[in-house]
Regions:
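Bacterial Sec-dependent N-terminal signal peptides
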Residues: 1-48
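First exposed extracellular module after export/assembly in secreted or surface-exposed proteins
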Residues: 4, 36-243
Length: 243
């Protein structure tokens, strides 16, 4: 499948979108009382070129594995790769779900952010009992996760919609909170993946235009607030086509 005007894939051959954890207040804007709402922001800013650009010490995301490696700050580069266990398949509304065996995160710190020279390394991201949604392509993934309080349960919801004015399809991603979700363990987040090629499988057209929108909070009237993903070229509409 040919990707048109999406992103520069030269430096990243695995997942291109890495979204990890809550609490990145510099990137995800929400009120101090966001815990009172049924939806929880679940995303931070990212870079297609290098992976995710963190807005706080990464030690707050994955406990000792990262803290023992280094502290990462704004501007540090993180590239996430993972393997997929194709024997772990389950039926879902997103066509096919696969189990992910592990996630490895490689990082490079910027000079001065940790008080010294630039450093690099990698660590394994702990994963238990998770699914990857989507008919997986080798390179085209969305990865995201959440960091929830230990005493609360969360789950993700992905819905398809269509802009009636332009005909552009939309993938809306929410993090919901209720008693039926997954309880967070310590401060570990849960990554997931979604293949953007699924938009083709949901359409009879040879070329599909779509946007990715992720929930960042709710306003004072209780209305959901979404942010539309924009790639590094400033494009908000992603276009994919069949070969």
């Amino acid at each position: 499948m040919k990707i048109l005007n999406v992103l520069n894939m030269k430096r990243i051959v695995f997942p291109f979108l890495v979204m990890l954890m809550l609490g990145m207040s510099g990137c995800v804007k929400h009120s101090d009382n966001v815990q009172n709402y049924p939806y929880i922001p679940a995303f931070v800013d990212f870079s297609f070129e290098y992976g995710i650009i963190l807005n706080t010490a990464i030690g707050s995301i994955v406990s000792s594995e990262i803290q023992n490696a280094t502290d990462l700050w704004t501007g540090d580069a993180v590239l996430v790769t993972f393997t997929v266990n194709y024997d772990q398949q389950a039926s879902t509304e997103y066509l096919i779900a696969y189990g992910v065996d592990y996630v490895k995160v490689g990082y490079t710190t910027a000079e001065g952010t940790t008080g010294g020279e630039s450093t690099s390394g990698s660590f394994d991201f702990p994963i238990e009992d998770m699914n990857v949604f989507g008919l997986l392509d080798k390179t085209l993934f969305l990865i995201f996760g959440h960091k929830a309080p230990e005493d609360q349960n969360f789950y993700y919801e992905m819905t398809f919609d269509r802009d009636v004015t332009t005909g552009t399809q939309m993938l809306k991603i929410r993090a919901r909170k209720n008693g039926e979700g997954t309880k967070a363990e310590k401060n570990i987040g849960y990554p997931y993946a979604f293949s953007i090629n699924n938009f083709l499988y949901h359409s009879s057209e040879n070329t599909v235009e779509f946007t990715i929108q992720y929930m960042t909070g709710v306003d004072e009237d209780g209305n959901e607030e979404f942010k539309t993903f924009v790639d590094e070229s400033g494009n908000s509409v992603i276009k994919i086509s069949r070969e």
